[in-house]
Design a protein with these regions (language model features):
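Beta-strand secondary-structure signal
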Residues: 26, 71, 149, 180-182, ...
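Carrier-protein-dependent adenylate-forming modules in NRPS/ANL systems
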Residues: 35, 45, 95-96, 125, ...
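Glycine-rich, acidic and aromatic/proline-enriched surface loops and short helix-turn segments
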Residues: 2-3
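His-Asp-centered acyl/peptidyl-transfer active-site segments
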Residues: 6-12, 19-23, 31, 40-53, ...
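AMP-binding/adenylate-forming domain of the ANL superfamily
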Residues: 20-39, 108-112, 170-188, 211
Length: 216
């Protein structure tokens, strides 16, 4: 834990200008575009979620270092028995994901590296992200904030396990979050939202940052 990197350190404006309000940037891929990504990911042995997670990490790394930690919102419905999937409730949990991006690595290698780390984390979800942040703070002797979030609900509705963990029209309101990248599949299309806290970044950063995600 003591060797885990901090959150991405993007250029920010003065703290006195920060407000607890978010703006939303949205985008969408067509059914054909999204199906092509899903099929390509499957052929390479990676998940579509990890593809988009890697794109998000790469975008942040353009304004930060290649080594940082991200806050992942996970659907964590324990397999106690078959009846668990009939229960309506909040089964989301947090994972703090280590990211180490080498500038000379090819894209598929970066995806596989992130996927390996994520799968390793999932094997230890009893010690979730909240516990990790608390332990890092204890070891480093400081309050730790991982305000860059990635939230995926890909395939949740298809699997019939939940109604989804993302509300397409509901903007993030959590003050400990700077950017929440949300992805979901709706009627065969990919919908993605970026909820960005106002007063954290200058407009000169926000537009290129989101555009790099859209165009990658």
């Amino acid at each position: 834990v003591k060797h885990m990197p901090y959150a991405p350190r993007l250029p920010m404006i003065e703290e006195s200008n920060r407000i607890n309000r978010f703006i939303r940037k949205t985008g969408q891929l067509s059914c054909e575009e999204w199906k092509n990504i899903e099929e390509t990911a499957k052929n390479y042995g990676v998940t579509a979620t990890c593809v988009l997670l890697t794109v998000y990490a790469l975008c942040l790394s353009k304004w930060s270092s290649p080594d940082f930690s991200l806050n992942l919102t996970m659907l964590n419905r324990p397999n106690i028995n078959d009846e668990i999937h009939k229960i309506v409730g909040d089964f989301t949990s947090v994972d703090i994901l280590e990211v180490h991006l080498g500038y000379r690595e090819i894209f598929i290698d970066q995806i596989k590296m992130i996927q390996r780390q994520l799968f390793s984390d999932l094997d230890h979800m009893e010690f979730n992200g909240v516990n990790v942040i608390r332990e890092i703070g204890h070891v480093k002797g400081e309050n730790i904030l991982i305000p860059y979030v990635f939230t995926s609900s890909l395939g949740i509705k298809k699997a019939g396990k939940a109604r989804g963990i993302i509300m397409p029209d509901g903007i993030s309101q959590t003050p400990q979050v700077y950017i929440d990248c949300q992805i979901m599949d709706i009627e065969g299309k990919l919908q993605y939202n970026w909820d960005i806290r106002e007063g954290i970044f200058s407009p000169e950063i926000i537009e290129p940052l989101f555009s790099s995600f859209c165009n990658t």
